[in-house]
Amino acid sequence: MEIPNPPTSKCITYWKRKVKSEYMRLRQLKRLQANMGAKALYVANFAKVQEKTQILNEEWKKLRVQPVQSMKPVSGHPFLKKCTIESIFPGFASQHMLMRSLNTVALVPIMYSWSPLQQNFMVEDETVLCNIPYMGDEVKEEDETFIEELINNYDGKVHGEEEMIPGSVLISDAVFLELVDALNQYSDEEEEGHNDTSDGKQDDSKEDLPVTRKRKRHAIEGNKKSSKKQFPNDMIFSAIASMFPENGVPDDMKERYRELTEMSDPNALPPQCTPNIDGPNAKSVQREQSLHSFHTLFCRRCFKYDCFLHPFHATPNVYKRKNKEIKIEPEPCGTDCFLLLEGAKEYAMLHNPRSKCSGRRRRRHHIVSASCSNASASAVAETKEGDSDRDTGNDWASSSSEANSRCQTPTKQKASPAPPQLCVVEAPSEPVEWTGAEESLFRVFHGTYFNNFCSIARLLGTKTCKQVFQFAVKESLILKLPTDELMNPSQKKKRKHRLWAAHCRKIQLKKDNSSTQVYNYQPCDHPDRPCDSTCPCIMTQNFCEKFCQCNPDCQNRFPGCRCKTQCNTKQCPCYLAVRECDPDLCLTCGASEHWDCKVVSCKNCSIQRGLKKHLLLAPSDVAGWGTFIKESVQKNEFISEYCGELISQDEADRRGKVYDKYMSSFLFNLNNDFVVDATRKGNKIRFANHSVNPNCYAKVVMVNGDHRIGIFAKRAIQAGEELFFDYRYSQADALKYVGIERETDVL
């Protein structure tokens, strides 16, 4: 007979009281532990200092110190003050000397701490005010409403004050685990009490019953359950959610507790974890599983792991690079080469999408060779039927994604038509053992090198290309390769010159008509339809870049330039569109030449190559610190990139109100979505001061899909000059923030 549960309202009230009391107890315990830890560290450090001081005193006692004879003060300088020098060491007599005053030294300008940075660093918005800035006593007395307005900009959220507001505490993971475990003990005690009362009633009626096997089994199972840790009751999570609503709903808390307990287990593996391919526990897995971390962590836009510039915008791309193809070698690589097998070379070349024979779109299937036996043909048919339930198009998409240097994640493409039935080369089967690591590596290499088994064997290093070929036939990977639509060469360029002229006119119209609205570039992702008014690139008036997943022949895609000069005039489409030449698109101007960065003919790729000038930081003649150039530069030559934190416009508004009070701001508008803030992180160009007659100018340039700020020379600048550029202040702000205008030299 089950014991009736108390009413739900009483249970929730009971658990709320328990949650509050346990949370307050844990807070006091944490504070006590922190205080005890600080005291223990202080005592330990003080003991170390005492020990070191005692050692030094003993060393000083062993030294033979001779007192220096005191010098008599020179008379005749009555205006000089006398001072007495006393020594703490015994044996040294006091000395009386004349005091000589030093000349006044100019103070170093005030500089707030900042971290050096060589590229933009995207950060998240700060929705909680970390600290209330100190503006001085004068500002505090005169403008008392500033602090209130600042706190209101963060919706009243200040770090450290959330504990005083009931229900607004964000519980840390450690405290959350301890709180749930502590509350779980109360539920265990209640259940034990209920079980004791129910067991007592049952034992009275069953005292004389014999111990049966069934009762023994129940007793053993009860002991096992009691030994294991019981999962907390749902009422506990409901009570915590009602007391701390900002931490989520009860289901979220339950899932959070389950994840934290699994993470605390040292033997538990993380989710979607593949064993180390170099370890003894390597497994034979599919290509997608082997490259899961690669596709997740590697940024295809800047070719880095854990990129800080595109952490939230990972977009796929199926655009095929126009690079040199890897072809199968015509001659065998050795005695164990697969090309020595009868028909293997023709078989691999026919199914290799990178060979010339696959360049034309085949309208009919090849006829099976007469030398091929019926058994071989039936074997191929059986292999195809066995693989019919696999998605051929998806397998190819995941394989071709790695060969694509612009692809971020495996993408889906249309399934290719069924490959022709060809005779499988029958080779004497050799008992070759493949480890899990070798099989996984083969599947990874096969997505890049396809049927070039000689290259795959060289990369594996443990198998011959004949063995690799036999394993590929066994895996039926050769039959999965599409040969028609996916890997066909570029289409005929019929209206190339006409389209290019129309494209250049479009750039000029866009340059003339458009307003100052510049939006951040986001790659479009609609491979099945052309770019129209719903395309995000067209909606934001951006060109489709090489990272977009639209058709390579898209009319909105920027194809690069065909210049053969320095690309520093408006004759260059890239320079006209205020963007740097792309090394993957501009193949004739020299932007794609990477052998020597300083001798490259194209002058419109300095930002992406980091060809900045040597700058010096020194006190400025205008205000505070200034940036000086160490080498002379010519007009319109690139000097440096303005780097800093990449923040949103809303975050810039919140930070700007504090910077205006300090009368020092390093905010620079990048586009309508983001702002570069060099206050906390930046480079030396952040110290360049404002002037209405500057020698530099700033320009926002599109560099490989990213807006970046370049500082260029407005005129010829000599070595040692201080750099100035126009902050574009209004007249009121210029009088407010700019105190001294630099003296302009008459040239």
UniProtKB/Swiss-Prot annotation:
Residues 613-728 form the SET domain. Residues 188-231, 378-421 are annotated as: Disordered. Keywords: Chromatin regulator, Isopeptide bond, Methyltransferase, Nucleus, Repressor, S-adenosyl-L-methionine, Transcription, Transcription regulation, Transferase, Ubl conjugation. Its main location: nucleus. Residues 194-211, 382-393 have a biased composition (Basic and acidic residues). It is found in: Nucleus. GO terms for cellular component: chromosome, telomeric region; ESC/E(Z) complex; heterochromatin; nucleoplasm; nucleus. Its EC number is 2.1.1.356. Residues 395-414 have a biased composition (Polar residues). InterPro entries: CXC_dom, EZH1/2-like, EZH1/2_MCSS, EZH1/EZH2, EZH1_SET, PRC2_HTH_1, Pre-SET_CXC, SANT/Myb. PROSITE patterns: CXC, SET. The keyword Repressor applies. A motif (Nuclear localization signal) lies at residues 491-496. It comes from the Eukaryota. Residues 504-606 form the CXC domain. CDD domains: SANT, SET_EZH1. Belongs to the class V-like SAM-binding methyltransferase superfamily. Histone-lysine methyltransferase family. EZ subfamily. Polycomb group (PcG) protein. Catalytic subunit of the PRC2/EED-EZH1 complex, which methylates 'Lys-27' of histone H3, leading to transcriptional repression of the affected target gene. Able to mono-, di- and trimethylate 'Lys-27' of histone H3 to form H3K27me1, H3K27me2 and H3K27me3, respectively. Required for embryonic stem cell derivation and self-renewal, suggesting that it is involved in safeguarding embryonic stem cell identity. This is Histone-lysine N-methyltransferase EZH1. It comes from Homo sapiens (Human).
